Amino acid sequence: ARIAVRAALTGHVIFSTLHAPSAVEAVIRLTDMGVAPYLAADALAGVVSQRLVRCRRSDGSYQGRFCLCEVVPAGRRLRDAIRRCAGVRDLTDAARSDGAVLLPDVIARTLAAGRTDEREIRRVCEGGSSW
């Protein structure tokens, strides 16, 4: 993680994956892996979290899949929150202020549109803990 952050700080575009319950919690995961908060704040351009869920059919069965995407740009407020080692709630508020599209909002729109059901969301989204 530290090598990737150093590369990002020198102008390289870095795409990476890591396991975290949400895009905001991925930022905390970086610091858990030894990246200094001020470096993470400077290196990040944004974080995307995705979940692949099954499409609900009208008969209650499933066919096909689609992606729930959470997109968190690293705006000024989020970077400031990262630098001060803010917790999940403050990071989430900062991300939302910077225009993030967060998973709970994506889930609400998806359920309202009838694209899948709550059972499938709970199955895929870690038992509903991330929303």
Segments from the language model and where they lie:
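Short, flexible helix-loop junctions that flank or precede catalytic/ligand sites
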Residues: 1-131
